Amino acid sequence: MTAPTPIIFLVDDEAAILKMVGLRLRAAGFVVAEFAAPAEFLAKYNPAVPGCLVLDMEMEVLTGLDVQEQLAALGSDLPIIFYSGRADVPMCVQAMKGGAVDFLTKSACHEDLVLAIHKALEYDRKARQKRLERDFIRARIASLTPRERMVLAHVATGKLNKQIAAALGTAEKTVKVHRGRVMAKMGVVSVAELMQLAAKCGSTFPTVD
């Protein structure tokens, strides 16, 4: 299946700059969606669409930082490149603390923006890949029975069947059967692989109480 084409979301309330930057980015080979009003972008934003956001810092109704804050409240991790008419250090620091991937002045050369966009798109690609892997692991965990999840939690800590049996108050041979099913459903053959899945899955991976 062909991956969807990333979109460069360009938000700037100055029409002339919006048009000029949009034309330059299209000439560089990007697919661009232009928004003169940040509220319009927020209303139409679809987190399923890959890409990045090139965002004017100083807008009248909603500032770039306001947009960044609202996206964060939505749980979005869309990469943001801020660009501003002036190099304001406090604003730049606040933007970067909020997770922006870059901060450029509007006087910066076009090549700098293109490079920043490529960096942001690579960041977005990797983040989406990690989410897909995490969702796949969670789907595997969801296929386990409650007892298998308990065994999984113990196996992931490196415990032997005998130790797991004692902890769960069951026979060692029963644990062996459950362990085999767990490994098969999780698609792994070793504890090391299981621990790698746990690291990718994060806090939703079953743990021993």
Where are these regions (language model features)?
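Active-site beta3 strand of CheY-like receiver
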Residues: 48-55
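Basic, Lys/Arg-enriched C-terminal extension of HTH/homeodomain DNA-binding domains
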Residues: 183-209
